[in-house]
């Protein structure tokens, strides 16, 4: 037994040990006349003290587990994974279940469960693992979850904070899907009525659609609704991490999934489209790698346009950096999730993000603490060139404050240099060069560079490869 399992077992035994302590306390009270008159401790005080310790220990232990939570936002449907033997799977440690949560599940108290989860909800500490372990103690998990959704009249104001109870509904149904609970005919019929009621509230509200699709997925109601309509709702919730899970669970056929992917591509959402390609088993019909490579170039070009449109001001450079970094981070996640690092060795996406963040920090530092001009000492003559006596140009405060100058390498060489967005600037002190001159013809739009190119060569325009086979 690991240390973690030992701690979890000990916490779960607190109630049992507290009962033994109460029995001993009652025996002691029977001989109260023999005790000191100053002994006035009551059982309620002892019980309150131990309950407080129990809650604190359980909370800290749950927080300790949450530092490396299992990923519940990525579900694979690769058929090859299904054939792997259970012996090769990693065995996750059983999370601790607080006694109050376990008792609610054992009593099939859906309303109490909702109130409890709202009370302890913490955005920084996911509850998926603990709830998944707890609801397994329920004799009728599906009925309990349905009771929680149907009968919840718990108002956020009574908890003293603003909270969307629908988040708890989604969590419970997500866990219900995960454990593949048994669903009786009566429970399914009740869920069907609730699903139709929730469907009437969807309209154009994505989160309402998310709850509705979870009802359909968790209670196996896919055959009760029109598949085309369900597919439209999946497109509406595509941005949520559970979108591919419910899409696979509600029975949307491959043809409609393919149509959904094309719609995402046409709507300018290539990252979401690629997620559906991998997690809905559509990589045999679509080519995700060209889509991602094209996305990288589009991100670079979009950031470059932000700079050019505002004459490469400091503000535009910061906005462009933020825009590109925020666009590349979900790409990095997909590359890691799908083990695609070998496909993007030339693009060096992570290095690009680090470079952008470093350059932004440098610009901020130089703007906050601009270089000070040394006061000119009296009686000293200006330095002149030994050949023609001309004054050697000294970089002015104005030049040093220019964003282009701040982005130049510390040791510049003669000639033209590339700034982080692929535009050329002069390396000669005191000479201002139009960053677009020589790169693009008059009236031409600026062209982007590949991430791996740091030599100053500008590539000719490239046609994007097709997103999917014709």
Curated annotation (Swiss-Prot):
Keyword Coiled coil attached: yes
Coiled coil: 336-369
Keywords: Coiled coil, Developmental protein, Differentiation, Flowering
Domain of life: Eukaryota
Any single GO BP term: cell differentiation
Segments for region (Disordered): 355-400
One Pfam family this sequence matches: Frigida
Disruption phenotype annotation: Reduced levels of FLC expression and early flowering, but not redundant with FRI. Frl1 and frl2 double mutants flower earlier than frl1 single mutant, due to a partial redundancy.
Keyword Coiled coil annotated: yes
Annotated Polar residues bias: 388-400
Tissue occurrence: Expressed during seed development and in dry seed. Preferentially expressed in the chalazal endosperm during early stages of seed development.
Miscellaneous notes: In cv. Columbia and cv. Landsberg erecta, either FRL1 or FRL2, but not both, is functional and required for FRI-mediated up-regulation of FLC.
Family of this protein: Belongs to the Frigida family.
Description of how the protein assembles with itself and partners: Component of the transcription activator complex FRI-C composed of FRI, FRL1, SUF4, FLX and FES1. Interacts with FRI and SUF4.
Record function comment: Required for FRI-mediated up-regulation of FLC transcripts, but not redundant with FRI and only partially redundant with FRL2. Required for the stabilization of the FRI-C complex.
Protein name: FRIGIDA-like protein 1
